[in-house]
């Protein structure tokens, strides 16, 4: 069943998607996403359709951005997003039948669906934020013979590349660095059948459901936090105050760590960061590892906190959601997507991420 999305849905998508961005987005992101949604609605209806609405051989386009959400200096631009999509259509010669986001919040995909006059599918490459294109590649990082287009647009650069996922993703990351940290991007075309087999099906519906739960929870911080925990089946890792935020921008990523001291125990939980929260540890013991969702909420306001919004002294609740309770694409379980992030962070990820029992 196809649903026409409106302003109330956009608010739910922003609320739910901000939490699912795992520290990549916070309250400062909401006005930007709202502007993308308003631009989308000005261009035409945004229609959410199930994956089964398209035949398996239909071509899809993925809407995303490449870069560092906190440290990058270049800001998201709706016109750049549309241009990236149109450049991809021109380069590939394919007319897409629908659009999906690389990951939530994914409001860029709403814009491209409206601009291209095609549906937004209830699917994503991942139903949570991830730091690299490869992690949203639907398993194609281990298939070097598979080629696709990636297009990026920024104030200082436009790039169109064709090749396998590993090569084109490296070039897109380099373009983002040259543009000050971020480019608006599109990639594809991919067949609907591949997304049906390997995508995070129902990701938009999950995002909207979480957002509606937050919007309906009431204004008190405690009710916001409780609604998030209840909907996601999350578990609290620490409730206290930020004591360290040592995250900085390097080579296209926000990298470093955030430490939160629990007010009840005095123990610190260390959060490893590569654009998003990737690990949580206490006394050297791993508590959660990407693709588990690790999120932060402000105890004073109940708002979701971005990593860049957590200076020392910030009162925060840190919680984790099991990867088994989230809509995930198969790219998350591809060993080829972890080495560069492990190297950047200096910690193991794949051993935990690929263990179904972890």
Swiss-Prot record:
Pfam families, A to Z: S-Me-THD_C, S-Me-THD_N
Hydrolase listed as a keyword: yes
EC number(s) on file: 3.13.-.-
Classification via Gene3D superfamilies: CV3147-like, CV3147-like domain
GO molecular function: hydrolase activity
Catalytic activity: S-methyl-thiohydantoin-5-propanoate + H2O = hydantoin-5-propanoate + methanethiol
Domain of life: Bacteria
Enzyme class: hydrolase
Leader sequence residues: none
Keywords tagged on the record: Hydrolase
Record function comment: Desulfurase involved in the catabolism of S-methyl ergothioneine. Catalyzes the hydrolysis of S-methyl-thiohydantoin-5-propanoate into hydantoin-5-propanoate and methanethiol, the third step in S-methyl ergothioneine degradation.
The protein's name: S-methyl thiohydantoin desulfurase
Organism lineage: Bacteria, Pseudomonadati, Pseudomonadota, Betaproteobacteria, Burkholderiales
